[in-house]
């Protein structure tokens, strides 16, 4: 059982060397359940289907998560009206952000969890809007987070450290702790800034916790955080480390991560990591000195539970979800079939290389790698829906780049 009593804050926990377990992926999980639209990936489900969002929060809490991130990924006003999205006009960004905060707080109060208000990269930045304009967008979300009194703030899912720094500077105005994660790999951000330099810039901007999230698999994210740590040490700048990777294997992706893979987003299932992969990830992250350990897209509650179970010796307790889960498959000793009972042991699962079950499935893919980033014509955003001619042009370009 988790400790009882008054909740300690994020920095109080991290400064004491405690492990803070983040939650998992919401947009992918809720898209598969029928509550989020793939493409815009916006979080209007917080208003339209609050029971679905609430239930997913509860499952992550039961699995051992110490943090309930508000379901505010891509909840900036410009994203909610981008390319024909109806949310900004019919619901409003303020209502989405407020509802997400209320749901996260309700569930966090059911356990030893903190509420984190989150912002992410914006269409405005990709369209080369000014620093003042982009910061104004973040500030609208921050106003809601302050009103709802979240426990700390996260700037997550940024491909460019420049925009992430702008977000951190705005979030620091609240006086609350700020964490910041980039969706980058070992090659650095899309402007070529190294992971080490990215970490230093984020920390100097005011982030108390820095790291990575999304776009890459667990072990790639650990490699990136290692470079961040080295950069911080070299610059003599202090910050806690965090990592919230994908739950997909991505050894073949390029600099932009899994969104470059041909399977994104509807055919990623063969790449899903096992719970045993997550045991290894949690241990590697802990040994590196990372103390905020969670997940992003593809991370389901059973992945979060694997983190909590792997680090139970350090934390001193198991999550409630472990009541129905035997350690390293030990519950299989109750199975009716003897060959399945024989799998009730750690070394079996650690040594197993899972098969895909697809005879003609390649082990690797060729990333699309269009190489576009901020300022490119194809990334300039618009309020109007994508036109048929724009799609025809993109289809033609895809054919050329695939040959």
UniProtKB/Swiss-Prot annotation:
Pfam families registered for this protein in UniProt: S-methyl_trans (PF02574)
Write down any Gene Ontology CC term.
cytoplasm
> Which EC main class describes this enzyme?
transferase
Protein residues bound to Zn(2+): 214, 296-297
Keywords carried by this UniProt record: Cytoplasm, Metal-binding, Methyltransferase, Transferase, Zinc
Q: Catalysed reaction per UniProt?
A: L-homocysteine + glycine betaine = N,N-dimethylglycine + L-methionine
What the entry lists under Gene3D superfamilies is as follows: Homocysteine-binding-like domain
Pathway(s) annotated for this protein in UniProt: Amine and polyamine degradation; betaine degradation; sarcosine from betaine: step 1/2; Amino-acid biosynthesis; L-methionine biosynthesis via de novo pathway; L-methionine from L-homocysteine (BhmT route): step 1/1
Q: Which GO terms describe its molecular function?
A: betaine-homocysteine S-methyltransferase activity; zinc ion binding
Describe the protein's quaternary organization and the partners it interacts with. Answer: Homotetramer.
Stored PANTHER family: BETAINE--HOMOCYSTEINE S-METHYLTRANSFERASE 1, HCY-BINDING DOMAIN-CONTAINING PROTEIN
Physiological role: Involved in the regulation of homocysteine metabolism. Converts betaine and homocysteine to dimethylglycine and methionine, respectively. This reaction is also required for the irreversible oxidation of choline.
Its protein name is Betaine--homocysteine S-methyltransferase 1
Naturally occurring in which organism (per UniProt): Xenopus tropicalis
**Annotated gene:** bhmt
């Amino acid at each position: 059982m988790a400790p009882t009593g008054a909740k300690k804050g994020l920095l109080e926990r991290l400064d004491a060397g405690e492990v803070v377990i983040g939650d998992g992926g919401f947009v992918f999980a809720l898209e598969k359940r029928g509550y989020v639209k793939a493409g815009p990936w916006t979080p209007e489900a917080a208003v339209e289907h609050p029971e679905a969002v609430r239930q997913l929060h509860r499952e992550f809490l039961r699995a051992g998560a110490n943090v309930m991130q508000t379901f505010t990924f891509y909840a900036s006003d410009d994203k909610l009206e981008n390319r024909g999205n109806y949310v900004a006009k019919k619901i409003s960004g303020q209502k989405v952000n407020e509802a997400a905060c209320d749901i996260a707080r309700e569930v966090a109060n059911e356990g030893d969890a903190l509420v984190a208000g989150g912002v992410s990269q914006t269409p405005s930045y990709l369209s080369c809007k000014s620093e003042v304009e982009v910061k104004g967008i973040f500030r609208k979300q921050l106003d809601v987070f302050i009103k709802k009194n979240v426990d700390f703030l996260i700037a997550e899912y940024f491909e460019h450290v420049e925009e992430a720094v702008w977000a951190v500077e705005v979030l620091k105005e609240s006086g609350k702790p700020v964490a910041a994660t980039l969706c980058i790999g070992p090659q650095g951000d899309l402007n070529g800034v190294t992971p080490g330099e990215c970490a230093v810039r984020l920390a100097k901007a005011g982030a108390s916790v820095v790291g990575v999230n999304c776009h890459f698999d667990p072990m790639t994210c650990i490699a990136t955080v290692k470079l961040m740590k080295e950069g911080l040490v070299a610059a003599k700048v202090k910050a806690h480390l965090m990592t919230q990777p994908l739950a997909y294997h991505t050894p073949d992706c390029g600099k932009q991560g899994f969104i470059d893979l041909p399977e994104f987003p509807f055919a990623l299932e063969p790449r899903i990591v096992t719970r045993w992969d997550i045991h290894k990830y949690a241990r590697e992250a802990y040994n590196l000195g990372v103390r905020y350990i969670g997940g992003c897209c593809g991370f389901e509650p059973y992945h979060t539970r694997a983190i909590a179970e792997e680090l139970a010796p350090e934390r001193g307790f198991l999550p409630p979800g472990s009541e129905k889960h035997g350690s390293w498959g030990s519950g299989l000793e109750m199975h009716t079939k003897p060959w399945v009972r024989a799998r009730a042991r750690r070394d079996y699962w650690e040594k197993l290389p899972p098969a895909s079950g697809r005879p003609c499935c390649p082990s690797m893919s060729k990333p699309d790698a269009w190489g576009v980033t901020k300022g490119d014509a194809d990334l300039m955003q618009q309020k109007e829906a994508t036109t048929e001619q724009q799609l025809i042009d993109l289809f033609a370009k895809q054919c050329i780049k695939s040959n």
